[in-house]
Amino acid sequence: LLLPIRRLQSTQASTSSDSSNQSPQSLPSDWEDEPPSLSEFTGLPHKDFGKNQHLETNEEFKRSLRGILREFPPMTYAFAYGSGVFPQSDATASLVTQSPHPNPPEAILKWQKGGGKMIDFILATRYTSHFHSLNLNRHKDHYSFLGKMGSSVVSHVNDKYGAGVYFNPYITVNGTLIKYGVVNLETLHRDLVNWDTLYLAGRLHKPVKILFEEPSIRVANQRNLLSAVRCALLLLPPNFTEKQLYSTITGLSYQGDPRMDYGSENPKKINNIVTHQIRNFRLLYHDLIMSLPNLSYTDTSAISKPTWLDDTTLDLKLQQDLDPSRRANMVRRLPKSFREKVYFLYRRKFNISGREYQDMLEASADEDAKGGLKKQSAGPFDRRIAE
């Protein structure tokens, strides 16, 4: 476990400084067309690539979160998320006795203002069977009846059903109530790049605290964040505010969620997330906004002020170019699985025959005949959708 910790700390050292007032470092124009898999951080397009993904918490809270993860078998990538990490409501004077944590570190109590909520984690590992085997030896009490059937059964359920995440909820570690989900690293990678389910990709559209890193996941998540911006732009009018943009992005993963329709989820949840985490949304997406040629801030002088990131009273205006060719390219660059679902919906709308549809899918495939990535250029069907 020490190796990934040292690797994480060494890679974060160059990203920990506040760079909010710096211009985004230019990216190679074809970085999205390169295979999104790396074995070393030195292979990133530049040394600061993806630094927007590293959102700040205080050091004591971060150490407490890492201390919790040290109680588990080694993992390759991990993040903490949800309202237990980044608040979705105004701080209240909660009493310590109201905390769900039996005996948490002081840093967690302070971060959660004395009360707090369960802390959620996603743990990504290259081999779920090995992880569960080690974890069952350490923490058999974390598992349901499936744990009695052995790690091979648990990992089969983990990898083959649903979104590929196996959760153990309501677990106490280091005196802190947590929920943790285990996922195969390849499953996480595919969802970030292709939006197979949007379950994990959607969580990473919102502010999270990354605790352990892996270079190919950093690249994949940067693609995921950029895809979220493009998808939101296709849903937004020519002029809108940054809160409308971030609300649209946040809402992508809630589309079709029955909890939002039947009242088991707060109907103001999206607004609460954006309102209370506006600074982190700016840190996460500002450089990506600046990198897109069809998107700009209406008043660029506002973002030149050194304090704009922290000014929660601002709701900056943005504008996008609705040129059909630009919008068609955004359709073409949507994640593969999600784009195919969009194509299927529009196939029915345009009454396209089955054979014509299959030819169109083959022409728009991301891979060439040799398995390499093709340059993503809009075709006639993308242009019809964008009109």
Put a short name on every predicted segment.
Residues 11-92:
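Helical scaffold of the NTase/Pol beta-like nucleotidyltransferase catalytic core
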Residues 135-231, 246:
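Conserved catalytic core of two-metal-ion nucleotidyltransferases
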